[in-house]
Amino acid sequence: MELIFLGTSAGVPTRTRNVTAILLNLQHPTQSGLWLFDCGEGTQHQLLHTAFNPGKLDKIFISHLHGDHLFGLPGLLCSRSMSGIVQPLTIYGPQGIREFVETALRISGSWTDYPLEIVEIGAGEIFDDGLRKVTAYPLEHPLECYGYRIEEHDKPGALNAQALKAAGVPPGPLFQELKAGKTIMLDDGRQINGADYLAAPVPGKALAIFGDTGPCDAALELAKGVDVMVHEATLDMAMEAKANSRGHSSTRQAAALAREAGVGKLIITHVSSRYDDKGCQHLLRECRSIFPATELANDFAVFNV
């Protein structure tokens, strides 16, 4: 999986940072996909500066209905239609997301020429497509807000082709059945169990993408053991009380959560517009003093999961 940050500013855009939007490129060899997490104003314009086509989007996840995470959605939906895109799109979000989208389209006399499904979610598993599952966790914010945990299922281990050939199994379709863990019967009556020729499963990757939040009970469960955790660091340590009063987190709180959850990497985003480049480096240093494996997301930054 690959993360591409389209917007990393909190509340309002700056000259160097747009408001929140994150692409997730699934990069699966047989079932690829492009997902978008939040869609602040100007997201479709940010997309133009990447190699990704809006027509490839198949799922959009909205954390909450504050404008800096949402106001780019109607324009993106309409542009997909104007471009002749017919690929279906599913939007997941909290209660009210359906009304927002339908009202914006109706009042503006707009429509979509592709199948559009809107799913209003609650806490819990959203879907499992057999390759990965997505679970929503409630966060601490003035509006109903969710973080999303994306978990790949473990992949089958490598098939020991040499051992199979030595056992008299001819390469070809039978190898595919054995790779799937099935048992086959050879012409001489022998049964070959694929599980006996498979290496240990390859653990799938796990990713946690937080919406806006102050400290909350569900945060640890959402982030526990993930390879990458994306979390806001709206304000620095000195302004922690102010951040919490508005349903946001400080650098210290983001880094402390990453350390407690045992994540592989922390990526901080949703930076207050009060911070220039020098100020952002200050935020990064504060996080790294607690959790060294921290990176600062800038617009168009790319991270592998």
Curated annotation (Swiss-Prot):
What Pfam families is this protein classified in? Lactamase_B_2
Gene3D superfamilies for the chain: Ribonuclease Z/Hydroxyacylglutathione hydrolase-like (3.60.15.10)
- Residues annotated as the enzyme's active site: D68
Q: Which CDD domains match?
A: RNaseZ_ZiPD-like_MBL-fold (cd07717)
Which of this chain's residues are annotated to bind Zn(2+) 2? Answer: D68, H69, D212, H270
Q: Name one GO molecular function term.
A: 3'-tRNA processing endoribonuclease activity
How is the cofactor bound, in the record's words?
Binds 2 Zn(2+) ions.
Record: residues binding Zn(2+) 1 = H64, H66, H141, D212
Q: What class of enzyme is it?
A: hydrolase
Essential cofactor(s): Zn(2+)
Q: Which UniProt keywords apply?
A: Endonuclease, Exonuclease, Hydrolase, Metal-binding, Nuclease, tRNA processing, Zinc
According to its UniProt record, which protein family does this protein belong to?
Answer: Belongs to the RNase Z family. RNase BN subfamily.
Subunit: Homodimer.
* Record PANTHER family: ZINC PHOSPHODIESTERASE ELAC PROTEIN 1
| Protein name as it appears in the record | Ribonuclease BN
The record's gene field reads rbn
